[in-house]
């Protein structure tokens, strides 16, 4: 799976985190591992221009998705076997997202993770124009985001444990060297 991120927003964000959440969602949705995704981060002026050009709506927005191929998520019972493809582009506006994050009481990173999940789901054909579609998409979005966060927490704890184990191992080697008369 190839995920490219281009940050033209002027705001420092964790590209690794964006790639991580996108890769997680794409994997959970059974998209072919050879799929490609492009993510672009823009400032509010560039996002407002894109929003007007493609959606005919004034002002910036948080996320826009531009699917390249007609795809259905592989996890859906009515979906055909997934094949390699270009999923499309997700465009994020960190400056706009920062305002939303502050209003929601969480970090910009958390907001961008949410918007990345939202953008990937749009690329896979999910929408929220109708109430039943919104209910389905937002429930799936919440579930995927919670699973990704849990996965990140578990990885963090495993990494911390590995660091502790390595320190103990290093100490035991030091004591082994002392007991055998070797100098460290």
Swiss-Prot record:
Q: Does the keyword Metal-binding apply?
A: yes
What does the note accompanying the cofactor annotation read? Binds 1 zinc ion.
GO molecular function, a single term? RNA endonuclease activity
Task: Write down a Pfam family by its short name.
Answer: YbeY
**Spans annotated as Disordered:** 156-184
Question: A single GO CC term, please?
Answer: cytoplasm
- Cellular location(s): Cytoplasm
Taxonomically, the superkingdom here is Bacteria
What are the names of the required cofactors? Answer: Zn(2+)
- GO annotation terms (biological process): rRNA processing
Q: Where does Zn(2+) bind?
A: 118, 122, 128
Q: Where is the composition biased (Basic and acidic residues)?
A: 157-184
- List the InterPro entries hit by this protein, alphabetically: MetalPrtase_cat_dom_sf_prd, YbeY, YbeY_CS
What are the protein's UniProt keywords? Cytoplasm, Endonuclease, Hydrolase, Metal-binding, Nuclease, Ribosome biogenesis, rRNA processing, Zinc
- Asked if the Swiss-Prot or TrEMBL record annotates the protein with the keyword Nuclease, the reply is yes
Q: Which SUPFAM superfamilies match?
A: Metalloproteases ('zincins'), catalytic domain
Q: Which family does it belong to?
A: Belongs to the endoribonuclease YbeY family.
UniProt function note: Single strand-specific metallo-endoribonuclease involved in late-stage 70S ribosome quality control and in maturation of the 3' terminus of the 16S rRNA.
Protein name in the entry: Endoribonuclease YbeY
Organism expressing this protein natively: Mycolicibacterium vanbaalenii (strain DSM 7251 / JCM 13017 / BCRC 16820 / KCTC 9966 / NRRL B-24157 / PYR-1) (Mycobacterium vanbaalenii)
**Gene name of the record:** ybeY
């Amino acid at each position: 799976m190839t995920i490219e991120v281009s940050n033209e927003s002027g705001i420092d964000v964790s590209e690794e985190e964006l790639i991580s959440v996108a890769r997680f969602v794409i994997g959970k949705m059974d998209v072919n591992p050879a799929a490609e995704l492009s993510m672009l981060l823009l400032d509010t002026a560039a996002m407002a221009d894109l929003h007007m050009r493609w959606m005919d709506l004034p002002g910036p927005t948080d996320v826009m998705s531009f699917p390249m191929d007609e795809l259905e998520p592989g996890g859906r019972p009515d979906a055909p076997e997934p094949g390699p493809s270009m999923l499309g582009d997700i465009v994020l506006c960190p400056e706009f997202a920062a305002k939303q994050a502050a209003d929601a009481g969480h970090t910009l990173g958390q907001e961008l993770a949410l918007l990345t999940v939202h953008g990937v789901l749009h690329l896979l054909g999910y929408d929220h124009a109708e109430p039943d579609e919104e209910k389905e998409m937002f429930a799936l979005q919440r579930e995927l985001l919670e699973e990704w966060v849990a996965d990140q927490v578990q990885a963090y704890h495993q990494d911390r444990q590995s660091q502790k184990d390595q320190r103990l191992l290093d100490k035991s080697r030091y004591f082994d060297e002392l007991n055998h008369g070797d100098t460290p």
